[in-house]
Amino acid sequence: SYDSRTAQLRIERDCAGVQHTGGSFPAFSLFFAEGTEDEVFDAWFAALGCRPRTTRRLAGYSSWYNRYQNIDEASIQEDLNGCKTLFRAGDLFQIDDGWERKVGDWLEPDPAKFPNGLRPLADAAHESGFLAGLWLAPFVCEKESLLCKNHPDWLLQVDGQPWCCGCNWSSFYALDIDHPEVQAYLKQVFDSVLQDWGFDLVKLDFLYGAAPFGNARESRAGRMQRAMALLRSWCGDKLILGCGVPVMPAFGIVDYCRIGCDVGLDWDDVWYMRLFHRERVSTRQSIGNTIFRRQLNGRAYGSDPDVFFLREENCKLTLQQKQTLARVNAMFSGIL
């Protein structure tokens, strides 16, 4: 952090609890460079040995920002039919949260919503010329899920209690990525989604749940990077859009990565939410994230600034605000 009042730069590394057997070790490495913005960031990523997995720019559709969890087979098919009039071959058609029974129960879609499963919808997207994408949150499960009820030993424990990551859904808990049965389950999940159901891209959310803290063997950042490497090993060459993940542990591992907060259906949410934190749901904050993290795009991965809106219904953004959001996203992103 930089304190402009005192002209002091403070650098910290989160390695609380990590134990070393003795001898010397590097606390962290520093990189100093001068030049234009492009020269400096190109040199830094070269020193890191980091290159993006793809330079392909994606555009497409997500079910989340209009239907949210209120999706079913008919509504997804309706949206797919609409996308045929807007998008080009090779664009992305992505089904978001709401297809599963409960977060954590990934092996079968909700039969009440998707009685024919998801394979027919992935096939329909392919027949329309689109890539098929699907949302999951692999490192967490909600309290009411069958996974949580049947496998409490799979949950990451702190002082004998499961670690609660947040209050979404029925509240949700972190999975222990060191548990061999957790790893086997998640491999089975990705085999099903990517091979059996035929999806080309997975949007993986709430990834921070893998590493809420470090331990005696590894720092929090090291654990997060190891979790990301596990995801890549399970997904092979399929496309990954990472979400809810610290930006650096995802460098060079995911194809695309969210680099900021969610946009909202209005400019800056209600007043009391502005007292919360910077990464809250906010179109205004999202635009700032996209601008000030622009250097990651095309160097670490394709940056995902979140969506922009074309519709007029169910959206309180003015035309100027929608245009500003779309222009900033178009300038500094790898996925639209």
In which residue ranges do the predicted regions lie?
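Generic alpha-helical structural element
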Residues: 65-72, 220, 316-320
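Histidine/cysteine- and/or acidic
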Residues: 114, 118-122, 220-230
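Aromatic-lined carbohydrate-recognition surfaces of secreted/lumenal glycan-active proteins
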Residues: 63-65, 94, 130-143, 224-257
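Aromatic-lined carbohydrate-binding/catalytic grooves of carbohydrate-active enzymes
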Residues: 58-61, 66-191, 195-214
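Short glycine/threonine-rich loop-to-helix capping motif typified by GTGT followed
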Residues: 214-221, 254-255
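Glycan-recognition surfaces
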Residues: 148-184, 188, 229-336
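Carbohydrate-recognition beta-sandwich/jelly-roll modules
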Residues: 1-91
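Short, well-ordered loop/turn elements at secondary-structure boundaries
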Residues: 55-56, 89, 127-129, 235, ...
